[in-house]
């Protein structure tokens, strides 16, 4: 089985090295990742310049584009390689709740799903670098189970690994997305020339970490797996919307 791996932290990130190393024990792996950190770019594609595919000394390929670009390049530009499955990650930091809408890690998996492939995004609920051993041990468990009977149809799964010691992981839970308050305040500043500039502020506090949510269960020490879908249609609102826009 051929597995394409990407991320949004860049091809030099620790997480993608771990994911590639473990996945290589189960499948034929190729890595195509951004040449630099592209966190938070969501599903954006590069349309204002051509893309270049280069190979690093460790064998990984990297692209001067976004995670979504990397999936397109990995699908159509790699010599003698057609992916059957796509893994994205391991992201340095969680991708849960509303944050999945901004995540380049989740976006890479989403693009693969749209192309008709099973896709899994992996993230570690920690940005300090202290729990990579937990992530690696969790991956061995997750991928051993995945490859026993790989999905035969496209799926889109978002996996988050807790920030606990390896021996303290409590198991796996299937969850729904939680929510957070969006309090991304603008932080004003000045550049060295004295010109006004702005930074996007920190994310808001989590507002829904109830039992059964990714925020709640991952925070309690569980590996969370959340099945995602692409269809954004608000089906319960169809009738109300039709009534509002009725013009006869």
From Swiss-Prot:
Could you identify this protein by its name?
5'-nucleotidase SurE
Primary residence: cytoplasm
Its source organism is: Neisseria gonorrhoeae (strain ATCC 700825 / FA 1090)
* InterPro entries from the UniProt entry: SurE (IPR030048), SurE-like_Pase/nucleotidase (IPR002828), SurE-like_sf (IPR036523)
Q: Which residues bind a divalent metal cation?
A: 8-9, 39, 91
- Cofactor note as given: Binds 1 divalent metal cation per subunit.
Instruction: Give the signal sequence positions.
Output: none
Family according to the record: Belongs to the SurE nucleotidase family.
Name the top EC class: hydrolase
> What EC number is given for this enzyme?
3.1.3.5
Q: Which cofactor does it need?
A: a divalent metal cation
Keyword terms, alphabetized = Cytoplasm, Hydrolase, Metal-binding, Nucleotide-binding
Where in the cell is the protein located?
A: Cytoplasm
- Please write the reaction equations for the catalytic activity of this protein: a ribonucleoside 5'-phosphate + H2O = a ribonucleoside + phosphate
Q: What is the lineage of its organism?
A: Bacteria, Pseudomonadati, Pseudomonadota, Betaproteobacteria, Neisseriales
UniProt GO cellular component terms: cytoplasm
Query: A single Pfam family, by name?
Result: SurE
Recorded GO terms, molecular function? Answer: 3'-nucleotidase activity; 5'-nucleotidase activity; exopolyphosphatase activity; metal ion binding; nucleotide binding
Question: What is the documented function of this protein?
Answer: Nucleotidase that shows phosphatase activity on nucleoside 5'-monophosphates.
Cystine connections: none
